Amino acid sequence: MTIQEELEATKQQFCIELNQVNSSKDLFDLKVRYLGKKGLFRCFADKLRECPLDQKALMGASINECKTYIEEQIREKNDSILLAEESAEFLKEKIDITLPGESHCPGGKHIVKKVLDDVVDIFICLGFCVREAPNIESEENNFSLLNFEEDHPARQMHDTFYLDGKTVLRTHTSNVQVRELSKGQPPIKVVAPGLCFRNEDISARSHVIFHQVEAFYLDRDVTLSDLTEMLTEFYHTFFKRKIELRLRHSYFPFVEPGIEVDVSCECRGSGCSLCKHTGWLEVAGAGMIHPQVLRNSGIDPEIYTGYAVGMGIERLAMLKHGISDIRLFCENDLRFLQQFS
């Protein structure tokens, strides 16, 4: 077979293989096979050197013509493949405008956080300053300095989470009161928000973790009337309606006298499920700071008096929004939470 015939056969074989190429990688492999340093045209170069001198010019021209043809076909095929690949990529990224839009779900404050912020803001407007204390507290600050007897039930492990013999997860934010009273002399007017922990059975009305706000005021001649006036203003602002206040005698180790605070229900006494048909909602525990608590902090109870009030934030949220189960606050159910966003 002459070189001319070999070139023609090579061209035909190339065209067959070129038609089967569908990717840039396959085209590159084909180019290397024909035009690479060890490709088919390397053989033609070797044969050209062995060709008689009078035929070299003609054979050289034929080889170059065939090589040029193959190079042009490869360029055209490459352009075609690139265009096809770009079109495929474009179609892949194309937005289907017939698809339904994706709804965005913006975040928002948790209902407990919203109520907590509202409560703290009201107390700030009433002249209180915000103070905080650790969630992990000594038994002394959590109980002893607040006038809890050694055998008080609240000290037992079935009511309190003990980390060791003398360290607990605080059961109330009253530990802030102990720390603030020991810092200096009155007047002291503080609101203390934070988490509390109690070893209780989880139910619709109680949980092992909850938020509490304690507010206390210590100065000369502070009376129970001052407490009543402050509470009336606070709950009127919080519930955004005029309320009546009812105080019931109760016992708390750190106050004397101790009182339970009720506010009039929105049903105006006609009775509803929220107030259990009593016309009243229990909202807080309060009282005048016990003289022994003041002595424990180095303050003379003959000179200074003060009041303290503690309220559960989840309880306030439940009363304000008619929520019947405290467990809902911890379940992260968007159907519930989005009602208050």
Curated annotation (Swiss-Prot):
Cofactor(s) required for function per UniProt: Mg(2+)
Catalytic reactions on record: tRNA(Phe) + L-phenylalanine + ATP = L-phenylalanyl-tRNA(Phe) + AMP + diphosphate + H(+)
Gene3D superfamilies: Bira Bifunctional Protein, Domain 2 (3.30.930.10)
Compartments where located: Cytoplasm
GO cellular component annotations of the record: cytoplasm
Binding site for Mg(2+): 256
InterPro entries, per the entry: aa-tRNA-synth_II, aa-tRNA-synth_II/BPL/LPL, Phe-tRNA-synth_IIc_asu, Phe-tRNA_ligase_II_N, Phe_tRNA_ligase_alpha1_bac, Phenylalanyl-tRNA_Synthase, tRNA-bd_arm
GO MF term set: ATP binding; magnesium ion binding; phenylalanine-tRNA ligase activity; tRNA binding
Main location: cytoplasm
GO biological process terms, semicolon-separated: phenylalanyl-tRNA aminoacylation
Keywords: Aminoacyl-tRNA synthetase, ATP-binding, Cytoplasm, Ligase, Magnesium, Metal-binding, Nucleotide-binding, Protein biosynthesis
Keyword Cell inner membrane attached: no
UniProt EC number: 6.1.1.20
Keyword ATP-binding: yes
Cofactor annotation comment: Binds 2 magnesium ions per tetramer.
Family: Belongs to the class-II aminoacyl-tRNA synthetase family. Phe-tRNA synthetase alpha subunit type 1 subfamily.
Binding partners and assembly: Tetramer of two alpha and two beta subunits.
The name this protein goes by in its record: Phenylalanine--tRNA ligase alpha subunit
Origin species: Chlamydia felis (strain Fe/C-56)
